Design a protein with these regions (language model features):
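Polyanion-engaging groove/track-forming segments
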Residues: 4-5, 9-219, 225
Length: 225
């Protein structure tokens, strides 16, 4: 269905013109959420080394391969990843990783929970400013904006409580909150292919309806019954 397959399959279809989504899309299944997860894992496995910091090679590879980063400079990120693999590096120095402003911001340490909050907001803002092209550029910025808004709300709520949290607790709260969110779509104008939740179909009258999935006994009754 749309939730499990994501909007990517829709965008890949060259024969589809206008697509109108009227159902909310789970944030946890978006590229924006996977990017946040990779940032979290990157910080979880950071290590202090001398006067600097290192990051675990698998986390670094995940960041460099993520579309939000790779599309900024495909040649640079691919070259960096190939060098890490060739040299069989386990830990990668932050100083070596900071090849441009975006990478410097991403590969910087964030220890306590307030630093993590500021780090997330800074990286999200930097990524959103990148000159992306393609059909999903607007969607990308909108998803990142939703995450930034929720990170800010969580920060404000915790500040009001005036409590100290371990970074692990903050990360758990952030994850649980983001995983429950759905991106609302306006559902207008009514043209092209309509992608809808099953309950939304009760009051519509289309010539062709394709039912992708539905649990037994949950199909809504016809409008005339």
């Amino acid at each position: 269905d749309v939730e499990s397959r994501g909007l990517g399959d829709v965008y890949k279809r060259q024969d589809i013109g206008r697509v109108n989504v009227t159902m909310g899309f789970p944030l946890r299944q978006s590229l924006a959420y996977t990017f946040v997860e990779r940032l979290v894992e990157l910080q979880n496995h950071r290590r202090k080394k001398g006067g600097g910091w290192t990051f675990y090679h698998a986390d670094v590879a995940g960041i460099l391969a993520h579309p939000y980063v790779a599309e900024c400079d495909a040649v640079l990120t691919r070259t960096m990843h190939e060098e890490i693999v060739r040299d069989r590096r386990i830990s990668v120095d932050a100083a070596w990783l900071g090849r441009n402003e975006l990478l410097k911001r991403i590969f910087s340490p964030a220890a306590e929970w307030r630093e993590l909050s500021d780090y997330m907001l800074g990286v999200i803002a930097a990524v959103a400013r990148q000159p992306y092209e393609g059909d999903d550029a607007k969607q990308r910025v909108e998803f990142l904006a939703v995450i930034a808004e929720q990170v800010t709300k969580l920060r404000n709520s915790l500040d009001e409580c005036d409590i100290e949290l371990a970074p692990e607790v903050y990360i758990s709260l952030l994850r649980r909150h983001l995983q429950t969110l759905r991106i609302p779509f306006e559902g207008e104008p009514l043209e092209g292919i309509q992608i809808m939740g099953i309950l939304e179909t009760r009051n519509v009258d289309f010539e062709n309806v394709i039912l992708l999935s539905c649990l037994l006994y949950t199909s809504p009754s016809p409008r005339d019954s």
